[in-house]
């Protein structure tokens, strides 16, 4: 949900069983003196952190973070808030927000996508070990102190005890859709080679993360690298979601929805029932069933088995059943979850 939604809208959606959420960030912050130069100003930057709470490098200079486009087309970098200092800003902002806006979830951008850093400020020095500690304390504040569903970007195993989902864990960083962190809603017709070969390259991908953490945290595609971003590989993304027992991610406006409604419904039906059936179960096995790796199978602790065919030829299983190209088979779904 966008941050501008009013309290009554949020409450109405809560009553419908929708997981309402708010975007938030405690890492990047722009110099207020540059605001007039920018094309847009991020309303969630912790502006009061500038400059006293910035990370300083060994030379005493503030390090550069996310770059924002200026009105003249140039890029202006943000500073980076020291992890030790970020917690106080969250502990002030979150409860104030919840007094009037009853969100049930909060997404903390960048925290698990950025490295552990050293800060050489004499006022708040930290080591990389400290950085890890304070990053996880920030997430723990959201999920445990304020009892919200908590998500963060990309993901890191150190944060698993404190978050419920990672936006971007399904999307391998170097192989995401072009400019996926900026022009997120733009649909692309041409699939870059690196995306086709590795992001949805069934010959190369292994669900190592899911084999360890599937029953602990939900993995999603990156918000600029979602299921319908590149329609030519939408089927492949759906198959990976089903195989890994993870939910899809969609982004659309009204025109996109009306144009592709049936395709969105198809994607939902092929992925969400599997995610629902396996969400709290450990992934216990992953197999390649053909020499070219086009047919793969995963098994979950509750007995669910998912088989998908990434290839362009039908596959006949040991029991004689045939799996069509881009097809999937789900067996062992508990009766209380449906298919």
Question: Could you say what each language-model-derived stretch is?
Answer:
Residues 66, 70-106, 110-339:
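Active-site-proximal substrate-binding groove within the catalytic cores of carbohydrate-active enzymes
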Residues 22, 26-96, 187-188:
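Active-site-adjacent "subsite" loops/lids of carbohydrate-active enzymes
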Residues 1-56, 140-143, 147-150, 307:
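Acidic/aromatic-lined carbohydrate-recognition and catalytic surfaces
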């Amino acid at each position: 949900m966008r941050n501008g939604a009013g309290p009554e809208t949020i409450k109405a959606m809560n009553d419908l069983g929708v997981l309402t959420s708010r975007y938030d960030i405690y890492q990047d912050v722009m110099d207020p003196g540059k605001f007039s130069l920018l094309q847009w100003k991020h309303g969630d930057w912790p502006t009061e952190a500038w400059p006293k709470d910035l990370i300083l490098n060994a030379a005493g200079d503030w390090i550069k973070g996310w770059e924002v486009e200026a009105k003249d087309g140039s890029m202006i970098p943000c500073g980076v808030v020291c992890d030790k200092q970020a917690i106080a800003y969250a502990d002030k902002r979150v409860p104030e927000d919840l007094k009037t806006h009853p969100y049930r979830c909060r997404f903390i951008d960048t925290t698990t996508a950025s490295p552990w850093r050293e800060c050489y400020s004499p006022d708040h020095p930290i080591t990389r070990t400290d950085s890890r500690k304070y990053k996880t304390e920030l997430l723990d504040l959201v999920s445990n102190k304020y009892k919200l569903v908590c998500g963060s970007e990309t993901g890191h195993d150190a944060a698993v005890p404190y978050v419920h989902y990672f936006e971007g864990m399904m999307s391998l960083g170097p192989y995401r859709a072009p400019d996926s962190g900026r022009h997120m809603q733009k649909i692309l017709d041409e699939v870059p080679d690196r995306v086709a070969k590795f992001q949805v390259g069934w010959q190369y991908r292994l669900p190592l993360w899911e084999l360890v953490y599937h029953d602990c945290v939900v993995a999603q595609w990156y918000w600029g690298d979602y299921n319908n971003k590149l329609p030519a590989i939408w089927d492949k993304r759906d198959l990976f979601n089903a195989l890994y027992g993870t939910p899809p991610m969609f982004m659309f406006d009204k025109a996109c929805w009306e144009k592709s409604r049936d395709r969105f419904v198809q994607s939902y039906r092929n992925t969400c029932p599997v995610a629902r059936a396996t969400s709290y179960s450990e992934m216990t096995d992953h197999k390649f069933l053909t020499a070219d790796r086009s047919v793969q199978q995963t098994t979950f602790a509750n007995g669910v088995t998912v088989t998908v065919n990434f290839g362009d030829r039908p596959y006949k299983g040991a029991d004689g059943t045939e799996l069509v190209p881009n097809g999937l088979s789900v067996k062992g779904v508990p009766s209380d979850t449906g298919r």
